[in-house]
């Protein structure tokens, strides 16, 4: 694409437009700046509400993929890539899943999580290399994330994923984006111009984070990774999480702390197992076997 075409393309992006409410940003007080930011941020959930039907469809696709041994893979550059890495990294401790189930890939690799990597988002071949490195396959779901909706790295990844039969999703903050036209489904979060012109780490980034929260949380809930509203598959790997697991057991069973602590120890810090052991008066192995017969779903096991 020649320079003039690029200029024209960028000029049409909502995320690159100036926000009329912040033209005097450099003359505002600290309070005025944060008040304006807060006012603008309040629009984000309202925008996402319009995309909930598409988000729910994607959640159902993710659950189906997980049940068939597939993975959820996020692909992005800069802020978008970092948010994907962040959401993926939170899944193992929160839901007790392995680190391969949800993966975040960022243009420029691990270094780009902390530092900008020049030209990384424009490297189309790198996206293919990165996806081949994790052996992306037709069972997986690829979610491309970019506020602009036209990041070359992400577009290349989406095209490659479609070629090999993966279900593809595009999350963008510009309407009718190039990414959305390629993907099987687009989630558009049109939050409007940022108060700091072009700084899509602000409202656009907030919108992306909220959508990613929904994708993984709703998917894991539907997989049986919670009971009531309790994260029963939490990995009790430090003092705070051991205490949380203990309180989860107490809430789910109504037992005293001493009983919860004792059973959690017997269950090797597995809160879900401990709850089942208490409610059905089972030993650990019997609880393990019963859960396995019920797809590891505590509600289904108890019913």
UniProtKB/Swiss-Prot annotation:
Which Pfam families does the annotation name? GKRP-like_C, GKRP_SIS_N
| EC number(s) reported in the record | 4.2.1.126
Signal sequence interval, chain numbering: none
| GO MF terms held by the record | carbohydrate derivative binding; carbon-oxygen lyase activity; ether hydrolase activity
Q: Tell me where on the tree of life, at the top rank, the source sits.
A: Bacteria
Pathway-wise, it operates in: Amino-sugar metabolism; 1,6-anhydro-N-acetylmuramate degradation; Amino-sugar metabolism; N-acetylmuramate degradation; Cell wall biogenesis; peptidoglycan recycling
Write down the chemical reaction(s) this protein catalyses: N-acetyl-D-muramate 6-phosphate + H2O = N-acetyl-D-glucosamine 6-phosphate + (R)-lactate
Record has Secreted as a keyword: no
Q: Which terms are listed as keywords in the entry?
A: Carbohydrate metabolism, Lyase
Single GO BP term: 1,6-anhydro-N-acetyl-beta-muramic acid catabolic process
Tell me which residues this entry annotates as catalytic. 90, 121
Record InterPro entries: Etherase_MurQ, Glucokinase_regulatory_CS, MURQ/GCKR, SIS_dom, SIS_dom_sf
Residue ranges constituting the SIS domain according to the UniProt record:
62-225
Quaternary structure?
Homodimer.
Other notes: A lyase-type mechanism (elimination/hydration) is suggested for the cleavage of the lactyl ether bond of MurNAc 6-phosphate, with the formation of an alpha,beta-unsaturated aldehyde intermediate with (E)-stereochemistry, followed by the syn addition of water to give product.
Family per UniProt?
Belongs to the GCKR-like family. MurNAc-6-P etherase subfamily.
The record's HAMAP family line, in alphabetical order, gives: MurQ
The protein's name is: N-acetylmuramic acid 6-phosphate etherase
**What is the organism field in this record?**
Histophilus somni (strain 2336) (Haemophilus somnus)
């Amino acid at each position: 694409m020649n320079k003039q075409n690029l200029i024209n393309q960028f000029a049409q992006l909502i995320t690159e437009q100036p926000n009329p409410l912040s033209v005097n940003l450099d003359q505002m007080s600290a309070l005025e700046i944060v008040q304006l930011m807060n006012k603008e941020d309040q629009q984000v959930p309202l925008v996402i509400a319009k995309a909930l039907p598409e988000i729910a469809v994607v959640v159902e696709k993710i659950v189906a993929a997980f049940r068939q041994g597939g993975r959820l893979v996020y692909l992005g550059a800069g802020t978008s890539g970092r948010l994907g890495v962040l959401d993926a990294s939170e899944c193992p401790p929160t839901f007790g899943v392995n680190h391969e189930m949800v993966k975040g890939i960022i243009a420029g690799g691990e270094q780009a999580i902390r530092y900008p990597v020049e030209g990384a988002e424009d490297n189309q071949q790198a996206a293919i290399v990165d996806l081949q490195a994790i052996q992306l396959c037709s069972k997986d779901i690829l979610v491309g994330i970019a506020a602009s909706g036209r990041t070359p790295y992400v577009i290349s990844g989406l095209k490659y994923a479609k070629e090999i039969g993966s279900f593809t999703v595009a999350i963008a903050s510009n309407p009718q984006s190039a990414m959305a036209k390629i993907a099987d489904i687009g989630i558009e979060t049109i939050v409007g111009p940022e108060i700091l012109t072009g700084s899509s780490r602000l409202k656009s980034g907030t919108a992306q984070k909220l959508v990613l929260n929904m994708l993984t949380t709703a998917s894991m809930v539907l997989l049986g990774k919670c009971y009531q509203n309790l994260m029963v598959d939490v990995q009790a790997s430090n003092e705070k999480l051991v205490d949380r697991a203990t309180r989860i057991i107490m809430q789910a069973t109504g037992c005293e702390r001493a009983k919860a602590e004792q059973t959690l120890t017997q269950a090797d810090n597995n809160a879900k197992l401990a709850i089942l052991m208490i409610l059905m008066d089972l030993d650990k192995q019997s609880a393990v076997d019963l859960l396995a017969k019920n797809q590891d779903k505590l509600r289904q096991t108890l019913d």
